[in-house]
Amino acid sequence: MAGILNVSALEIMDSRGNPTVEVEVILDDGSMGRAAVPSGASTGVHEAHELRDGGDRYLGKGVAKAVDFVNTEIDDALAGLEADDQRLIDQTLLELDGTENKSRLGANALLGVSMAVAHAAADSAGLELFRYVGGPNGHVLPVPMMNILNGGAHADSGVDVQEFMIAPIGAETFAEALQVGAEVYHSLKDVIKAKGLSTGLGDEGGFAPSVESTKAALDLIVEAIEKAGYTLGEDVALALDVASSEFYEDGVYNFEGGKHSSAEMVEVYADLVEQYPIVSIEDPLDEDDWEGYVTLTEKLGDKIQIVGDDLFVTNPSRLQEGIDRGAANALLVKVNQIGTLSETFDAVELAHRNGYRTMMSHRSGETEDTTIADLAVALNCGQIKTGAPARSERVAKYNQLLRIERYLEGAAVYAGRSAFPRFKN
């Protein structure tokens, strides 16, 4: 395999108008790989450190320091290393940084390099990225968990739940699932407009109407599904990302105008699951409310997928704690939460080995980079969360999955309902 000739970075823009890091890696055989790093709005306190410049430039959000680290220290450290040894590359990056949370060089610098090296190695091998990473086992196309109604930190809609998603579980192929999702999305616009509500969009392409409650938002989506000609719970199921750490303070959940205990929130979710065909709830409790997660998992874990995002932050050690405690039963996978591909692979492998489902995910601040689409297939995640079927930084991932499905031809399998074995409608 070819060795690394040059590693360079560029400060580019993400979908929220903030700077982010793009890295280009050139190998000595002329192969090249490029990757751009995403950034979150609602970030967990246990995530790897995203290095920002501070000061006045870009309101403190510049990434010139991270770019400079890539162009100097990291370029020097990786020179001549074999690009196909991802473990060695990532271990070199971790040792060079030297901190537990990647705060010296920044997880945004490390991740950009880690992903770009993988792209370059795939190019050198003459393989698609998903095939290079996943080998022949990478053939399952994920269910698109489409965030078609935005709330929380992703919008100014007034509703506390951050994401209301649809899951096209009844489709036969990914292409069909995308069609179903797009039709429901457009139907939702008509439903919202007919009620005199705003059809403005949130960070991830979903609509952000001002609604009074979680149930009111779900009712809009239910109406849209039926208006589009699909059967609720059979063709299309529902999912939530509550992002509850955003409204948790001093041991209390400030939810929908009331102050709730962890036990009371568990009952809120039990009521929702009873009334709606919900297959998945992400971050239903605070990122450090381990006892609450155990209680919730005991109550609803045999019925739905309970996803740890801020709880696990794609970190194998935190995931292991969750496994040991019996907290949640699924892992959200965000590459920039942990900072290298090798650590991401370890987290996914640990999850699958212990019966936890996995959902590959974007961030609210995205770029046209499509790496996570390939990773979702390579790692057999079975689910991907990358926004509404709108805004090019979201659609880019869906389009890449369409290409992968075409590439695989008869070998492609759409996860569909099998991605949610606990759901029985």
Swiss-Prot record:
Q: Name one GO cellular component term.
A: extracellular region
Where is the protein situated, by its record's location annotation?
A: Cytoplasm; Secreted; Cell surface
Q: How is the cofactor bound?
A: Binds a second Mg(2+) ion via substrate during catalysis.
Task: Output the PROSITE patterns linked to this UniProt entry.
Answer: ENOLASE (PS00164)
The entry's (2R)-2-phosphoglycerate-binding residues are: 162, 334, 363-364, 385
Decide whether keyword Cytoplasm is in the record: yes
Q: Which amino acid positions bind Mg(2+), per UniProt?
A: 241, 282, 309
List the Pfam families.
Enolase_C, Enolase_N
Show the CDD domains listed in the entry. Answer: enolase
Active site at 204, 334
- Record's InterPro entries? Enolase, Enolase-like_C_sf, Enolase-like_N, Enolase_C, Enolase_CS, Enolase_N
User: Can you name one GO molecular function term for this protein?
Assistant: magnesium ion binding
Q: Which key words are in the record?
A: Cytoplasm, Glycolysis, Lyase, Magnesium, Metal-binding, Secreted
Required cofactors, per record?
Mg(2+)
**Keyword set includes Amino-acid biosynthesis:** no
Q: Which Gene3D superfamilies match?
A: Enolase-like C-terminal domain (3.20.20.120), Enolase-like, N-terminal domain (3.30.390.10)
Q: Which coarse location class applies to the principal site listed for this UniProt protein?
A: cytoplasm
Biological process (GO) annotations?
glycolytic process
SMART domains in UniProt = Enolase_C, Enolase_N
- Tell me which family the UniProt entry assigns to this protein: Belongs to the enolase family.
According to its UniProt entry, the function of this protein is described as:
Catalyzes the reversible conversion of 2-phosphoglycerate (2-PG) into phosphoenolpyruvate (PEP). It is essential for the degradation of carbohydrates via glycolysis.
Question: How is this protein named in the record?
Answer: Enolase
- Taxon lineage: Bacteria, Bacillati, Actinomycetota, Actinomycetes, Mycobacteriales
